[in-house]
């Protein structure tokens, strides 16, 4: 029903489709008369919330949450990729500590 309202609205706005008194479409006929009451009765109907639309809105909400999570994950992955690496690896630090015979101090931190 909604698609019919959209098609009729677009056709009337473009002047391509004009509904005549006999309810047959006339293409490129701008002189034909059409009933305004018929158009208003079609376009003024309020869409009602149905059981079909509620699950679809929750699915859209779930999809939005997944996309937000994925975007945050990509940002974190980019930060980890561009993070400056430490000048010294942990094993290298321990090796230097053993080789220096306790003259150097190796600080191990996270």
Swiss-Prot record:
One of its GO terms (cellular component) is extracellular region. It comes from the Eukaryota. The keyword Phosphoprotein does not apply. Keywords: Glycoprotein, Host cytoplasm, Host nucleus, Secreted, Signal, Virulence. Its main location: secreted. A motif (RxLR-dEER) lies at residues 61-74. Residues 1-22 form the signal peptide. Belongs to the RxLR effector family. The RxLR-dEER motif acts to carry the protein into the host cell cytoplasm through binding to cell surface phosphatidylinositol-3-phosphate. This is Secreted RxLR effector protein 89.
């Amino acid at each position: 029903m909604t698609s019919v309202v959209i098609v009729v609205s677009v056709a009337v706005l473009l002047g391509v489709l004009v509904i005549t008194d006999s309810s047959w479409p006339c293409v490129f006929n701008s002189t034909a008369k059409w009933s305004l009451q018929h158009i208003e009765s079609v376009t003024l109907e309020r869409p009602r919330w149905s059981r079909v639309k509620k699950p679809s809105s929750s699915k859209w909400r779930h999809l939005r949450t997944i996309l937000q999570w994925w975007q945050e994950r990509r940002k974190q992955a980019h930060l980890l990729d561009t993070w400056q690496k430490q000048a010294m690896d942990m094993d290298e630090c321990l090796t230097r500590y053993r080789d220096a015979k306790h003259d150097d101090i190796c600080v191990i931190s996270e």
